A protein has these predicted regions:
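A cross-family kinase active-site recognition segment
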Residues: 110-164, 184-186, 292-293
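ATP/Mg2+ or Mg2+-diphosphate-binding catalytic cores
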Residues: 153-154, 275-317
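Active-site acidic catalytic loop and adjacent metal/ATP-binding pocket
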Residues: 31-44, 49-50, 81, 175-221, ...
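Conserved NTP-binding catalytic cores of kinases and kinase-like/nucleotidyltransferase enzymes
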Residues: 1-85, 201-204, 311-317
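All-alpha amphipathic helical-bundle segments outside canonical DNA-binding/catalytic cores
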Residues: 256-268
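A glycine-centered beta->alpha junction motif in the catalytic cores
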Residues: 98-111, 150-158, 273-289
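ATP-binding pocket architecture of kinase catalytic cores
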Residues: 43-136
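Active-site activation/catalytic loop segments of kinase-like enzymes and analogous catalytic loops
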Residues: 220-255, 270-287
């Protein structure tokens, strides 16, 4: 179970008291997290999620609080940091930054259909529109293009011939097209919008969670990350009907530009590289530990399938 920082009931009761939400009824560690420690918290006045942030600089935590406040004020279904009765949102527990947030209704879906994908595309467009231009809150990701080039080059020697050649080709493409990628239209992006970070009740999207990889960056990169997960089949091939539903719903709210249409195949590959590398690193770092490790080969397979992209962006000339 991925509870990196275990907590005892008395510690929790002391921490939760300043929120004025009643007695602690129950709490449970969440096994699904792979980077942070999360607990479901039941208090007399409702259901909540407590997050202890395990990765990233503490000084960047106000970014996440401010971003979620902006999205909450834009009526998007996102968690947001609750304040204590003294108005404090960011607190500390066991030496880690700690946030208490409302627990959103719904559950994750394992198999997405076109209706699910359309709702995710629509919500992602709303997220980007709410934070583009002057509304964007700046934060540089710690897993951007420079990180991919550095970590990818280091990992080449860890791979056998075929995956090494696949990764090298992708790194060469990132180097060649880096300036064009960075010049694409920008906003705040979720940067991790996988199926396990969205909540559904049936086919109704009820929430988007886990913004701890969020940053400012190219909106197309965010689209590519999400589509690679929501619209891939078991062999890593993009499913046309799901992809068209996703992209059509997104573009109905924020039409894609000519530059985005040109870089779409590249960006799908870049999004694969980012998660292939982070999973390879996690697999080495946490080998033999009781930590959820996502399969790196899933994104190696997807990158191989993205060498040819047959689903273009819906772009009106």
């Amino acid at each position: 179970m991925s509870v990196f920082t275990p907590l005892a009931r008395p510690e929790l009761e002391t921490f939760l008291a300043p929120y004025g939400l009643g007695r602690l009824l129950d709490f449970q560690g969440i096994a699904a997290g792979s980077e942070n420690t999360n607990f479901f918290i039941s208090l007399e006045q409702g259901e909540f999620v407590l997050t202890l942030v395990e990765r990233g600089p503490v000084q960047e935590m106000p970014f996440f609080i401010d971003l979620l406040d902006v999205l909450h004020e834009a009526d998007l279904p996102v968690p947001y940091a609750l304040r204590t009765t003294d108005g404090v949102a960011l607190r500390e527990l066991k030496g880690k930054p700690a946030l208490l947030q409302p627990r959103l209704s719904g559950k994750h879906i394992k198999v997405a259909n076109a209706q699910h994908c359309a709702q995710v595309g629509e919500l992602q467009a709303h997220l980007h529109l709410a934070t583009q231009g002057e509304r964007m809150i700046k934060r540089k990701t710690d897993r951007g293009l420079d990180w991919m080039l550095e970590e990818g080059t280091e990992f080449l020697s860890h791979l056998s011939d075929e995956p090494r050649a696949l990764l090298q080709k992708a790194l060469d493409e990132i180097t060649e097209r880096k300036d064009k990628i960075l010049a694409l239209p920008r906003a705040n992006i979720h940067a991790d919008l996988f199926r396990d970070n969205a909540m559904f009740e049936g086919t109704h999207l009820t929430g988007l969670i886990d913004f701890y990889n969020a940053c400012s960056g190219p909106m197309l990169y965010d689209v590519a990350i999400a589509l690679n997960d929501w619209c891939s089949d078991e062999e890593g091939v993009i499913d046309g009907p799901r992809a068209r539903a996703f992209l059509g719903a997104y573009a109905a709210l924020r039409p894609f530009t000519a530059a985005e249409a040109e870089l779409w195949p590249t960006m799908l590959r870049v999004a694969c590289v980012r998660f292939w590398l982070s999973r390879l690193i996690a697999a080495e770092q946490f080998a033999g530990q009781d930590v959820l490790i996502h399969d790196p080969q899933e994104f190696e397979q997807r990158l191989a399938q993205r060498q040819k992209v047959s689903t273009p962006l819906p772009f009106a000339l």
